[in-house]
Each structure stands twice: as C-alpha cells, then as structure tokens.
Amino acid sequence: MKQKCVLIITDGIGYNKNSKFNAFEAAKKPSYEKLFKEIPNSLLKTSGLAVGLPEGQMGNSEVGHMCIGSGRTIYQNLVRINKVIENKELEKNENLQKLLAKCKRVHIIGLYSDGGVHSMDTHFKAMLEICAKNGNEVFAHAITDGRDVSPKSGLNFIKDLKEFCENLGVHFATLCGRFYAMDRDKRWDRVKEYYECLLGKAYKVPNLLEYLQKSYDENVTDEFIKAAQNENYKGMREEDGIIFINFRNDRMKQLVEVLNSKDFKEFEREKIFENLLTMSVYDDKFKLPVLFEKEKIENTLAQVISKAGLSQLHTAETEKYAHVTFFFNGGKEELLENETRVLIPSPKVKTYDEKPQMSAFEVCDAVKKGIEKGEDFIVVNFANGDMVGHTGDFNAAIKAVEAVDTCLGEIIECAKKHDYAFIITSDHGNCEAMQDEKGNLLTNHTTFDVFVFVQAKGVSKIKDNMGLSNIAASVLKILDLEIPKEMNEALF
C-alpha cells in the first residue's frame, strides 16, 4: 500500500440532504461528481461527542483540525470548562483568586453568545458572578457574534446580559462586534477601535441595548457593530484586572498583544495593562496566567511522520493557516523536523463574498509544487466553504464551492500523475445550509456529517460510523508507518 499522501480539508462543506439554499448542491462541481462516481466515499461525524464537544454542539475548525491531526477525540475546552463551572470549582482557581485579591476593579471581556466556538455566554455569566460575589467592582465588555450564531440574535443575548448585570450590580460597560474586537488577520485599525473603546474613548450611549437595535435599523448586524460604551463608563485603569473568557485562542491574540505587549508598535497606545488572565493559553509568548492549561497531546500525525524521517508540507491561506499548523499539530506552534509551512495571504477584502475564490488558486499551486517536489505528506485547507458561508451570501457561497472544485480537479490530476494517494474531507459543514425554512440567513456552522473520499492502493471501501479522528491512522496506513496506540482506527 505504501504511497505518498495528500490530505485535503475543504473547510465548511458538509452533506445536507435538503437541496434548498444548499450552496454545495447548487454549485457546478465536475470534480466532486467524478469523485462520487469513481472513488470510495462515505460520511463522517464532525459535531458533538464525536469531536469532544457537548452532544448536539456544532463542530468548528479548531476542534476539527485537532481531531484530524491527533487521530483521537480530545475533550475540548468547552466541555472541560462546563464541568468545572457545574462543580463550583472555577472560583477555587488559584490564578483567578490571585487576580481578584490584587485588583479591586475587574473587566470581563469576551464573545457573548451560545455559539460555543470561541466562547459561551454561560462562562461569561459565571465569571461575572464569581467576581461580583468576591466584592470586586466588575465591568462587562460584550463582543457581539452574528457569525457562529444568526446575524441578529445579539439582541436577545445582550438583553439577557444587561438584565444579568443589573441584578448582580455589575457595570455593563461596552459593546462591540467581533469584526473589530476579534480580528486575527493583523488589521490593526479594527483592533485599535476596540482598544479605544476599552479605554473609554468610544461613542457614548445611554443604553447599549437600544444602541444595538439602532444598529440593526441601519442594517448593521451583530458581527459588525461599531464599538460603543455606556455613557457612565470612564475606561480601564492600568492597575485594573482583565479576564478574557474566550477559550479559543486565535481571535483573542491580537487584542491581548495590544493591551499587554511592551514591544507592540502597530499604533500608539496610551496605556499598557499587566494584570491579565486568559481562559486558555492564547500564545506561549505571552507568559500570562491562564485558567485552563493546555492538555499535552503526543504522537500526533505530524509528529509520527517527522519521527519517521519523512517530509511534510502544511499549507493554507491566512484565515486557516493556524488550523493546518497549530491546531493540526495538537496545539503546538513549533516547526517539526522536515516540516515545511507555506502561508498564502488571504485577500484584503472586508468580507469574503466580495472575493469568493479567496486565495484558493494560489493555495492549489502550493500543493502542486509540493507534489512535484516529492513531499511525503501534504495537508492543505481550502477556506472558501466556511469563510464565504459565514457571510450568508448564497450566490457567493456557490462560487466558493466552484473555486474549491476547480482546485480539487487540478490537485487530483497532479496526484495521480505522481502516484500520490489522497484523502478529501471537511472539518465541519457550513455552506450547505445558507438559510432556514423561514428565509433567515444562516451564517453559522452546521451539525451535518461531511464527505470523505479515499483514493489509495488497495482501498475499495470505507468503514461505517467513522469520524474525523479516524483520518490520521488512515494517512499513516497509506504511508506504511506504525499507528500509535493513542490513535483511533483507520477508515479502511
């Protein structure tokens, strides 16, 4: 069976038997049609317990790539944090106790929704409650979502938070959309707007809930809400404590850098803050206290390939680069021996419906070069189905799928020419459900299964009831390497 192998992750493309508002079904996709007819294929689970999330919880790119790259189900931070809160153990956390003892005033920052991808509203409320009951003066800074949940769901979430704050005697200080507060593509002008808001230098309003409704009236939805502050909020002081409740790291790193890094030079800052506490490890370089330390994940797919002395290429465009490197490698940033990484810049557009092909063709070229160079293993992510799916633009999502389909055709042809095996799958669904039955836009991930295709010597059938955690062992089987005991079985 020994063959070199390409693993293609088509982000945000899932299987939905309902063809209505299904961008995957509506797209012209000759490469996929050929795959369905000629290549062994099946469906994989990408949500809930299958990927270490609560039952019924939609999967996401972080969880999906970690599951694929580690070859096992890892209980995610969401599940770990839920358990600690349920057992009343969060308030006993040593780092939290230290911060609350040191700082009289405490600011809680995070994405406020029940999306469960970056954060959870219940975690935000639990933290507010712990800090308030401890006697600290507490300020809530809510980031509106509209991406992992529906675009105007924020009104109910923020109403809930406002009432919760009033009942607790907590200040509801600021409101801002994740487009600004949670940028991850070094668009520092966006983060600067949020930084100014936290310092008390933003647009002042008497009622943040009314401000949100007014934004809707002006066709500005949750993700894009401009930073605003309650008129009574005077800003953060340098001696204040700041707690970040997002458990996913990639969209909080830039904000933490702006608030805390002494070496930051992207724009002038009036204040730098020292007393920060993050829910999880956002970046090892920050050297900040955290509430939940990283779980060590050993013998990942990338590690096994590296230890065997084989070469590997990891490539994606900016939006998904962390997923094929940090997350795929089990939460490790450092480069492995014989591992090459190729980052293709994502296009500089406001939202990706403006350019649905994104940088797919450049990513495709990087893969073909890797095959021609003879890399033993290649993992690639095509971001289009997910990133364009998040915009809610159905026609743009169709074009996104068509761009991915074109790239698949080129990679498959190149792989066959050089006798490479390939596995094609997705980390989760998105673009296969762009509207609900009432016509509301769906910008979030789905809980649908995803396709998997395997073209390799001797493979004619894929086992039933498999998941993302079965892919790593499949790659190792194709490469003729020993499968470590930590991994789940192969797909075939």
Per-segment meaning from a language model:
Residues 1-492:
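Feature captures the catalytic ectodomains and active-site-proximal regions of enzymes
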